[in-house]
């Protein structure tokens, strides 16, 4: 199925819709959603990507044409983890402009222009409910938000992660290098506001 995305000018005035391929081919500004699930125990869920084996968002992708951000949040969680949540009460964290210019192995350029809408939502069910595609998501990792924030602050040490697959759950110790950052990003810049939001909400 062809995906259509709404696209905008640099001042974020709506222009029209275009296929996802053409949006990227023509460097058009569009919306994405970054979904984070957390628990009342200050835990936050990361997916472990099958391609990079690093901790990333709980789920993320494009906001389709005509979708609201929260509708996209719900769809992405369903598509990637196969759980249906009520995202209407998801809490806003930030909007992050994203520009990427990357030369590929064939010497052509991949260019991305997006605004990432970052939200968190409370997850109150069992981790065994997950049913994800191992070709896309290797595992899901559950870490304590306070401990993770301290790890990013001191830049050393390890924290305990609960690793969840479709078949088993186990504990392991992980260091800062397991979390995904890209060029020119720091761990606190990428994850600090999210972790702070989860910590504040978990107190409620």
Model region roles, listed by residue range:
Residues 53-54, 100-102, 111-204:
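Nudix hydrolase/Nudix homology domain
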Residues 32-63:
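A glycine-rich, hydrophobic loop/mini-helix early in the fold
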Residues 1-34, 38-40:
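Acidic, metal-coordinating catalytic segment for phosphate/diphosphate chemistry
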Residues 46, 58-95:
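The catalytic Nudix box helix
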Residues 24-28, 96-114:
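Acidic pyrophosphate-coordinating catalytic loop
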Residues 14-17, 46, 172:
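A sequence-level detector of short linear motifs
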């Amino acid at each position: 199925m062809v995906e259509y995305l709404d696209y905008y000018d640099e001042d974020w005035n709506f222009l029209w819709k275009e296929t996802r391929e053409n949006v990227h081919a023509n460097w058009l500004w569009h919306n994405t959603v970054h979904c984070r699930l957390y628990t009342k125990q200050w835990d936050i869920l990361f997916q472990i990507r099958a391609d990079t084996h690093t901790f990333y968002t709980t789920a993320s992708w494009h906001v389709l044409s005509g979708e609201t951000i929260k509708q996209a949040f719900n769809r992405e969680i369903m598509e990637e983890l196969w759980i249906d949540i009520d995202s209407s009460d998801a809490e806003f964290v930030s909007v992050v402009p994203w520009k990427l210019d990357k030369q590929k192995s064939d010497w052509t350029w991949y260019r991305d222009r997006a605004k990432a809408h970052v939200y968190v939502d409370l997850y109150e069910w069992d981790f065994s409910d997950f049913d994800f595609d191992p070709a896309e998501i290797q595992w899901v990792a559950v870490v304590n938000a306070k401990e993770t924030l301290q790890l990013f602050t001191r830049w050393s040490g390890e924290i305990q992660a609960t690793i969840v697959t479709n078949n088993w759950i186990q504990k392991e110790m992980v260091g800062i290098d397991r979390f995904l950052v890209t060029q020119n990003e720091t761990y606190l810049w990428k994850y600090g506001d999210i972790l702070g939001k989860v910590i504040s909400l978990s107190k409620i």
